[in-house]
Structures are given as C-alpha cells and as structure tokens.
Design a protein with these regions (language model features):
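A short acidic, amphipathic alpha-helical/loop segment
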Residues: 20, 103-106, 186, 210-214, ...
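Hydrophobic alpha-helix position signal
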Residues: 25, 191, 215, 243-246
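A local structural micro-motif
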Residues: 33-34, 163, 199, 223, ...
Length: 250
C-alpha cells in the first residue's frame, strides 16, 4: 500500500527521520513512501509566490524557512544509496500558478524526481485553506470557478504525475450557489486524458463521496495519502479509508 504524500516540513534531512518514517509505515502496512517537500521551502521556486495577497496568507508565507534545493537533492542521493524494507520515492509538491507556468516548466526540467504532485493552494493569491476567516468577504462562486479553472490548467500543463487533494476547497463546507458535479466530471475526464493519478487525502477528511464515485467511474488511479508533516503521521487513519477508497474486496 502506498502513502502518496509525506512531507519533511520542519523535520531535518537525516537518516534518523527516514528510519522513523519507515518504522511508522511498517506499523500501518504501508509498503511505498512518497516523500516530498513544498516548493515554498526552496529558494529556486519562490517566484511562484510573488503574487500572494491577504494578511493571513502573507503572514503564513513570512514564517516559512527557505533552503537551497541542493540540500534536498543531496539527501535524496544519500537515502537512495541505502536499503530499506519499504520502497521510497522522492518528489515535490508544487503550488501550481498558471501565470508562472513557463518559468515553472524550465525550473522543473532541471531535476529528476520520481514524481511531482501539482496542487492548487492559492486562489487569487489567497491561501483559501489556511483558515476559514480568509473566506470572509470573498465571492464564493468566483473562488470556486477560479479553483476549478486552475485545476484544469494544472492538469493540462502535463507537468505533474499526481493531482494533490483535489477537493480541498470544500474543507470548510462552504459551497457555491451552483452544483459541483459538472466541474468534478470535467476534472475526472481531464485526469483520464492526461494519464494522471490523484489521492484520497486522509489529513483533510478524504474525498467527498460524490467526487470519489466520479473518479472511480472514470477509472482514475487513486492512492491514499496521509499528507504527513511529522514522521508519526505516516499512514494516518488509512484503515478507516481503505474500504471507502478501494472497495471491501481489494
């Protein structure tokens, strides 16, 4: 079983952290780890965040610690030189911004990661999932339309292997005035067309039932993801999501 979304976050790039992640994986019957960090951690990708706006979002970004991506790449080489009882893959979670797509493509071409997750974390420069307060005064319909537009552009960019937490926008149970099903159907069809996978992210309560059923109907590959930011969150709550995601006989 895959845990397809595990961050180092504030944890150091050390073999001790890898050992702890592997130990947690074995406890939860996880056989493959997809390890990553956000692009906002690395100097080389900070151009993606030039248009952030709103007090909450700007405050969030100012607290981030940035390092050169070479630190991560050297650590990847070290880990790949070792043997572990689980498979370990390394990648990035990219905050997709269509206005910087050409520059992003050039930067990503410099690296040879095992996988790339593309995620929509900001709408019109605002980190919509940072806290419910960021929704105050916003046009919910426009937020949703922009979210799905960015998601379409992300998939059509052909830069990514996996679409990260695809219905994260519903995290606060704030919904637009229009039905979501046509948008969800379109996302599923695009994922199919562009041979992309997606995830059932257990940190965020999992995929909503309607979206999960649409993805299944289109035979979109889905794996479980803990979205762990600490080693002890690897495989978080997977037992509660296996049947829902894969069916009782799988």
């Amino acid at each position: 079983m895959i845990d397809g979304h595990i961050h180092f976050h504030k944890q150091p790039y050390t073999l001790e952290i890898i050992d702890l992640m592997v130990e947690e994986a074995l406890k939860n019957d996880v056989t493959t780890l997809y390890l990553l960090d956000h692009t906002h951690k690395f100097y080389e990708f900070l151009f993606l965040y030039d248009n952030l706006s709103g007090d909450e979002t700007l405050g969030w970004f100012k607290k981030k610690i940035h390092v050169p991506i070479s630190e991560y790449l050297e650590f990847i080489k070290l880990v790949k030189s070792k043997e572990y009882p689980v498979e370990i893959k390394f990648g990035l979670e990219v905050c997709y911004m269509y206005e910087y797509e050409d520059r992003l493509k050039e930067e990503l071409a410099k690296y040879d990661f095992d996988f790339l997750i593309g995620s929509v974390h900001q709408i019109k420069g605002i980190g919509y999932d940072l806290c419910v307060e960021v929704w105050e005064g916003q046009d919910t319909d426009e937020f949703y339309k922009e979210y799905y537009y960015k998601t379409r552009r992300l998939i059509e960019s052909n830069l990514f292997d996996i679409l990260g937490h695809p219905d994260c926008i519903t995290a606060y149970e704030i919904y637009p005035s229009f039905p979501l099903k046509p948008y969800l159907e379109e996302i599923a069809m695009l994922l199919k067309k562009h041979n992309m996978k997606t995830e059932n992210n257990t940190k965020r309560g999992g995929l909503k039932h309607e979206f999960l059923e649409i993805l299944k109907a289109h035979n979109i590959p889905i794996h479980l993801s803990s979205d762990a930011h600490r080693y002890y969150e690897v495989g978080r709550d997977f037992k509660d999501y296996i049947d829902i995601t894969f069916g009782k006989n799988e």
